[in-house]
Amino acid sequence: MKPPLLVFIVCLLWLKDSHCAPTWKDKTAISENLKSFSEVGEIDADEEVKKALTGIKQMKIMMERKEKEHTNLMSTLKKCREEKQEALKLLNEVQEHLEEEERLCRESLADSWGECRSCLENNCMRIYTTCQPSWSSVKNKIERFFRKIYQFLFPFHEDNEKDLPISEKLIEEDAQLTQMEDVFSQLTVDVNSLFNRSFNVFRQMQQEFDQTFQSHFISDTDLTEPYFFPAFSKEPMTKADLEQCWDIPNFFQLFCNFSVSIYESVSETITKMLKAIEDLPKQDKAPDHGGLISKMLPGQDRGLCGELDQNLSRCFKFHEKCQKCQAHLSEDCPDVPALHTELDEAIRLVNVSNQQYGQILQMTRKHLEDTAYLVEKMRGQFGWVSELANQAPETEIIFNSIQVVPRIHEGNISKQDETMMTDLSILPSSNFTLKIPLEESAESSNFIGYVVAKALQHFKEHFKTW
């Protein structure tokens, strides 16, 4: 025997198409016609059931696609996490190396720091870079260089507890990955269970379906995704983006090479600056060149640059101090400047890997949320059909009673105030009363459609959750 919901719906449709819907005038005929719904058997399968079965298969195919995407995302996420840990390990190694070099250099330069500091803070440096604007970038570079030297000569001892949040963060990341895996696995189990129950319904009703639908349902061909699939707010990453990998050893070697060239550049610019300062007296001794620097600059800078013409002898002392400072740095601390640059780049590498991991993590979470949303939406739309597999073959729809109930309006009872009520027992749901308003009477062309819609709505509302 067909599942009772199917029989109920198709009988209603048969009544509608046959134009034999009962009228309000003949309540006895109404009662007998409604009771006969469960006795009609040889009718084609209802389109609502076919639509629901098709939707369940679409749900299954969608989940298979999402599972592949989720697997790729999780694989990329774990790979990014490994690279982030490698970057942190590399940073720790650079820090340890730098700390050792700083310790040795600190011992060598402690006595000569005064000369280096006066070199940096001397007014001649300020005057010269003001009068020669093209050297301002050189000055900034040198100042940054000396600030780093000062920091390691007089280090600020940070609290070692900063390592604790890192370990806690790793534990938190492990928990996040595990939770996402568990949630997606549960979604997969739920969808497979729903599909298996719905497939049992298809097997029970297979003889009632046409051959085209049977072939369509049992085929492995991908179906077009349902029209209600929501569009993702983000464009999906390309495969190249997902599989991007940092070659950390080679990448870091580039940083090392770059840092060496920076140090050499700093040393070279210091030498050029000092040589230029040394040549200034020769220029001032030339005829008609007195105050040449002041004449070449705007009014607000002339006074300052005039000091350079008047204090050349003092700037020679500045020149000598900077030469000593440069010699101390190059001889006693050859590796420290390069290591500071390497440390900066190692920190940048850690930040880049953290940012990359965060982006992939956000994308994976969004993918999981979208998948859960689609599963819930499709389950609510089509999942009710799986409950038909739980019904015994002899289960039928039973119409217990039919009655017309008048509504009292200002003490008058009229035919237009009557409401038809029928008690139904449908599938696993408890008995319920269907109230049919006057505008949906049996004389109306919408009568059967109204009853069908109400029956399906009642069943879906009482469809059990996962």
From Swiss-Prot:
SMART domains: CLa (SM00035), CLb (SM00030). GO terms for cellular component: extracellular space; nucleus. Disulfide bonds join 105-333, 116-325, 119-322, 124-315, 131-305. GO terms for molecular function: misfolded protein binding. Glycans are attached at residues 196, 257, 311, 351, 412, 431. Belongs to the clusterin family. This is Clusterin-like protein 1. It comes from Homo sapiens (Human). The gene is CLUL1.
